[in-house]
Amino acid sequence: MEELKGYLEKSQSKQQHFLYPLLFLEYIYALAHDHGLNVNGSIFYEPAEMSGYDNKFSSLLVKRLITRMYQQNFLINSVNDSNQNRFVGHNKNFYSQMISEGFAVIVEIPFSLRLVSSLEEKKEIPKSQNLRSIHSIFPFFEDKLSHLNYVSDILIPYPVHLKILVQILQCWIQDVPSLHLLRFFFHEYHNWNNIITPKKSSYGFSKENPRLFRFLYNSYVVECESILVFLRKQSSYLRSTSSGTFLERTHFYEKIEQQHLVVLCYNDFQKILWLFKDPFMHYVRYQGKSILASKGTHFLMKKWKSYFVNFWQCHFHFWSQPRRIHINQFSKFSFYFLGYLSNVPINPSAVKSQMLENSFLIDTVTKKFETIVPIVPMIGSLSKAKFCNVLGNPISKPVWADLLDSDIIDRFGRICRNLSHYYSGSSKKQSLYRIKYILRLSCARTLARKHKSTVRAFMQRLGSEFLEEFFTEEEKVISLALPRISYPLHKLYRERIWYXDIIRINDLVNHL
């Protein structure tokens, strides 16, 4: 990274980052290979039919690639006559795929260096786990959402036009050859609708190069959110700043006017920003789903909805369905986010008060942010994974019946502990207990199937040692103290706990 930083500093002195020459450096592909090992494997291996060995990283392939890249029209020829690469076997576009993986590493370099430099300026580099923890969102929800009135459940629209993606990156990367290469990849992966595929709670990416398309998608989402951040910042000091300054800071408002749909114009800019002024507005996003919450009125939320739809249509040139944005009251609505079913119910209560000889009742209303394990979708997810049927009845997992007993118990126990760890912040544990029961009994049925025995006989033979494999470390400590606990400790056991070491959504939860 130090070598890359020195190279880019030289390029920056000429007012440009020249990223394209980095494609001719061998260690770039080594970085892509190392990243591939940590994710889903990599293509930088010598094929077995060529090397005579099992899959191993081959610098020879990289050297061949770099040599051929110096040839004129190499990329064009590799697409038009992809069968000429006979030594790569069934993968016709092997070389272009190698280049795309290397290119994915290169385009991230300026953003990584910019992040490091900004943290160094603050003289404080926070722990990466704290920056990446997705569960840090929920303490924020607990503090803020109970005081708000309305919530918008937003699905960010897809797919975006390929030219728009290139235009987005032009703001960050001025290296023209790199942008041309990006257009080449778009031409190769022509079926863009299959590159980013929608799911209920997450987006899937192209199997050919998920890192590149994840980077492109994140760039697109940042562009979508930039207008929201801009309006939020400007509305906070609207009265002290002239409207002319706003138009000098951004260009996309002019594009909107050219589309003959005047959402923001020079004369009414201050007035329109004033309409969106809301000091109690909060926005949170994970992958393709975002939450916009406000203390304002329903009319204000409808204006935000209309503005988002118009912005997507004019700036990204595609139709966005208004039904992708739902507006609801917190007291009457539950929303799915990061595998939790969350809501803010109103809990009425009566307090008896007495003054001298007179006593009377005072009606009070409290609101508390609730996080619940969605049991019906979770049972559906467990059913797809063959741990139970669609009704939630545990079944055996035959594909694991050939493993050792210790491996079977370890696999089931690890899944159960991970789910307990992920859903530790649930305010109601009954659904979590049912999920753990399904996994424990599915494990027992799998072992009984392997040994051709009954579940009852197998459970009696293993005893409590079998159940301990499904406890988390925290539950083991508390279970030892349960016979002698006081009430506060028992209450602590039922409280929500958010862990800052959870950096991605659980695989079973991801199906929700």
From Swiss-Prot:
One of its GO terms (cellular component) is chloroplast. Its main location: plastid. One of its GO terms (biological process) is tRNA processing. InterPro entries: Domain_X, Maturase_MatK, Maturase_MatK_N. The keyword 4Fe-4S does not apply. It is found in: Plastid, Chloroplast. It comes from the Eukaryota. Pfam families: Intron_maturas2 (PF01348), MatK_N (PF01824). Belongs to the intron maturase 2 family. MatK subfamily. This is Maturase K. The gene is matK.
